[in-house]
Amino acid sequence: MRFRGLDLNLLVALDALMTERQLTAAARRINLSQPAMSAAIARLRNYFHDDLFVMQGRELILTPRAEALAPAVRDTLLHIQLSVIAWDPIKPAESDRRFRIILSDFMTLIFMEKVIKRIAREAPRVTFELLPLDDDPDELLRRGDVDFLILPDLLMPNIHPKAKLFDETLVCVGCPMNKQLEDRLSMEKFMSMGHVAAKFGRLMKPSVEQWLLLEHGFRRRIELVVPGFTLIPPLLVGTDRIATLPMRLVKHFEQTIPLKIVEHPLPPLHFPLAVQWPALHNTDPGNIWMREIMFDEASRMEASSETSAV
């Protein structure tokens, strides 16, 4: 199909090339042979009167013209896919849908593991790609490159729909042999002790406990930074360091790496965890189905926590 002389199929090829930045990967993404993709590049260059891509090693470097085209091409294809082409109703037992989800290692272990096990029973052909926390999740959501973002609500962008999953509480923990934890922690002592903290992404963004502590005007002495919450418990054992961790994570490790929970000198640090999805996926039957599974599993977790607290 052509529109003003442009074969619209070429936009699909152009988007794949701009996303993958590699000829072979782009061809594989849209099920073209490498010669066919090379031919598509030649036709694109002829239409736009620009090289569009310059090869450096194995990577395709976008020209300024291609960089300018990228957002418009992606948005056009997304709107066609999500607004013009009718959504197929999902049949879980037959679906081979792949869901891409950005979340922390903590949420993978505590929450997503339950969802994945349930999906394996109810929709065995559905697959997942779990991605580490990104420096710019808003852009990935806008482009529809990911299906879900699971984060503390306060760290989420506000321009996409979202919904609460469950509440979490942060607790102060350390090695049971740490003699500094024998008495109640004063704020002065808490701030003077060495801390282990998780930071995420290339920019090493602070995690939720850092945001909440900064909100109260406190800066800890962070002696060790790691790229995930699940790395922290073993690094506290045999040391005088402490950490502020989600209670569910501490409970998860209590059989293998028991940690001492001490009363936090700050007021209770509660926060809601939420799931967010691209606005363009709001009416996608597959996305709705997965959301409902997540909400159901989150409700079960909340109910289980309330029961164990009684």
Swiss-Prot record:
| SUPFAM superfamilies xrefs | Periplasmic binding protein-like II, Winged helix' DNA-binding domain
Q: What is the lineage of its organism?
A: Bacteria, Pseudomonadati, Pseudomonadota, Alphaproteobacteria, Hyphomicrobiales
Which intervals hold domain HTH lysR-type?
Answer: 6-63
Q: Which GO terms describe its molecular function?
A: DNA binding; DNA-binding transcription factor activity
What is the role of this chain? NodD regulates the expression of the nodABCFE genes which encode other nodulation proteins. NodD is also a negative regulator of its own expression. Binds flavonoids as inducers.
Enumerate the UniProt keywords alphabetically: Activator, DNA-binding, Nodulation, Repressor, Transcription, Transcription regulation
Native species = Neorhizobium galegae (Rhizobium galegae)
- PANTHER family in UniProt: HTH-TYPE TRANSCRIPTIONAL REGULATOR LEUO (PTHR30118:SF6), HTH-TYPE TRANSCRIPTIONAL REGULATOR LEUO-RELATED (PTHR30118)
Where DNA binds (residue ranges)?
Answer: 23-42
Recorded family membership: Belongs to the LysR transcriptional regulatory family.
Q: Does the keyword Ion transport apply?
A: no
Its name, as the record gives it, is: Nodulation protein D 1
